[in-house]
């Protein structure tokens, strides 16, 4: 927990390595995520850096690999393995040169095969079209279409309905066109030829493959009868405009067409054989490439990252050594030293690399070491803001509080089970799903949050049991603490009154109907409340008070955590002027309210009793906490006790009018007055405490500096310098002593404004944030009501109201509808809503009490991370 509760200690280091060993050393460092390099050449353009040529070389190799990958995917060949797994050792230079040559030859071969395949497919397409044209032409002539065309053209010529056509025999053109263009083609041709062309068409049943795009297309064969060369020219231009292909050498006789058809089909068969062999060869080549693709890509990308890191280094004066600066977690410094030594040995360097730890005033990056379980919770915190260096990390507490607050809003046993099963499915199939390398963004979002889904489902089951709620129904495990106090004659009387039109209202008074001897219900909510008319009144009151208690508890816990930050920073002024006043303010008002809620639950029951030494007549005198809180701030006088002094009159107590507004424990007004005064005093302490302390410290340091600077006039300059330097050291010590406060370099005005903002934010935030926690009650109410409405709308009104065989079938149909609506609305939509509200409660209400989040992340150089990012891009 140590590394997660507070970020790791960091060290700023300088790395000096020999030029020839730099590559292997950086490559060895990249095997573990321990080092974040600093760019020592910020003003140098990325295209002018030392290793830009090497990066371009491997960029070209990566481009070739991406081309091969596109061809492999196009042929639906599976690429085994993952890029970011396995060994991260870089191949020797000779093997990398061989790989470069292999990729060049592969790209050349695949492109050559693509060109050859495209040409073969184009020839195959031409032959298939020619075969279809020959078949359809026979069909046209067998149907007597030539005689019909001759007759129609001659009739048009004799009637003079259109301009006269040229003399001569009737000719025809045969062609092929895409089916979707046929209608437009016929209309344009009819108008362009002034109704003097006769056209007929027929669809080709077989789908043809476009050699350019590979898509399946539908085409039609057409035949056009016309007279004269002029009309032929017009037709050819229209065909060209519609990208229709004409076959001008179509045989005139059936015998010639039959001979041509036999020749075409023989050539088609030969081409199919050649295409099959070409595909087999292409498949073998791409399959071999696919088996090695991830390893090749991994090597190329790792080498690129090494050169990118080397571009962050600078040279020494003689150009023999590389100098780099980096951040390293303190506990991994020795691991990095070992990695550097291994890299130097691998390169055969005779000069031992040097790793120096430097002093710096720069704030280190924040590094919280996580695993696959804690990473999602750390991600939730980091989404709001990266923790300031060595600041207390909210993530360990979020692991419990986040799913718990979610379950308060999503508390349903049935819905929790669904969410739990979804989380379990992701967790149990974790390795299998990772190996499939699914790139769908929504899926990866759910998969990344698999552990938080699991916990939210588990906690929702717990909350559902407490609420006694499962798909809007209660379950009776421990029986009910309520009983029927009425006899048969009383029930008969109610039934008779109901039959006479009078409204019957059966009321179970807790004085008589509840089993007081059995104590509170064993666990959760009594199931009888599910059928009660005043169910919402009871549940709303309970959940509202629970929300207030949980909210104030979490905010108080946040304030307590701020104490550990102040202690770690050795800032006593923050403890006395921030933490203590904040705790007193929170305790005097809000923790006091929580105490009142709990005491009211414990002591103010339905029966007459003595509470805190005062006579309590019954539930109608239970104190009103809301009005009591208002009276507390107004310091309004209230009656002491619930009954009038003087005891009983006629055997009964004389109750105070509006007894629920009375003081319910001795000295309540005085105690509450003291609490209000303390809370009010805390505000100016928070507002002026640190600014006043700052002024006092400035005066003290100025006085010390003035005293140290007093030097006798006759002292030699060297001695004077020593005295003055001593004063500077004292000043630096004072600066160091109070440096953790964070305000020593700020002016009084800046600190005053800062404190004013934070004081106002805290005081108003305590009120607004407490109200904000009421969303726990509001969303729980909305979820329960929506679940109940869905149950009644689907089951009661729908399937369960139908009898007979139809009802038997309807139950299955209605259950399917209920299941779909439950998953889509009550689990996904309501779950997302509760998740976002829980996110807000943690980011604002909880973390604002102690978390600054002003840091920047530690981004270590790592082969695994670089490969994962490149794969996701």
Swiss-Prot record:
Matches recorded under Pfam families: V_ATPase_I
Ranges per topology, Cytoplasmic: 1-407, 467-543, 596-614, 690-785, 829-873
GO cellular component: apical plasma membrane; cell body membrane; cytoplasmic vesicle; exocytic vesicle; multivesicular body; multivesicular body membrane; plasma membrane; vacuolar proton-transporting V-type ATPase complex
Tissue: Expressed in the H-shaped excretory cell (at protein level). Expressed in hypodermal cells around the vulva. Expressed in the main epidermal syncytium. Expressed in the sheath cells associated with head and tail sensory organs; specifically, expressed in the apical sheath cells of the amphids and CEP neuron and in the sheath cells of the OLQ sensory organ.
Entry's Gene Ontology BP terms: collagen and cuticulin-based cuticle development; exosomal secretion; multicellular organismal-level water homeostasis; nematode larval development; regulation of secretion; vacuolar acidification
Effect of residue 830 to Q: Impaired alae formation. Animals are shorter and dumpier. Accumulation of multivesicular bodies in the epidermis. Impaired secretion of Hedgehog-related peptides such as wrt-2 in the epidermis
Topology class, membrane: Multi-pass membrane protein
Domain of life: Eukaryota
Keyword Cell division: no
Residues passing through the membrane, by range: 408-428, 446-466, 544-564, 575-595, 615-635, 669-689, 786-806, 808-828
Quaternary structure note: V-ATPase is a heteromultimeric enzyme made up of two complexes: the ATP-hydrolytic V1 complex and the proton translocation V0 complex. The V1 complex consists of three catalytic AB heterodimers that form a heterohexamer, three peripheral stalks each consisting of EG heterodimers, one central rotor including subunits D and F, and the regulatory subunits C and H. The proton translocation complex V0 consists of the proton transport subunit a, a ring of proteolipid subunits c9c'', rotary subunit d, subunits e and f, and the accessory subunits vah-19/Ac45 and vah-20/PRR.
The name this protein goes by in its record: V-type proton ATPase 116 kDa subunit a 2
Organism the protein comes from: Caenorhabditis elegans
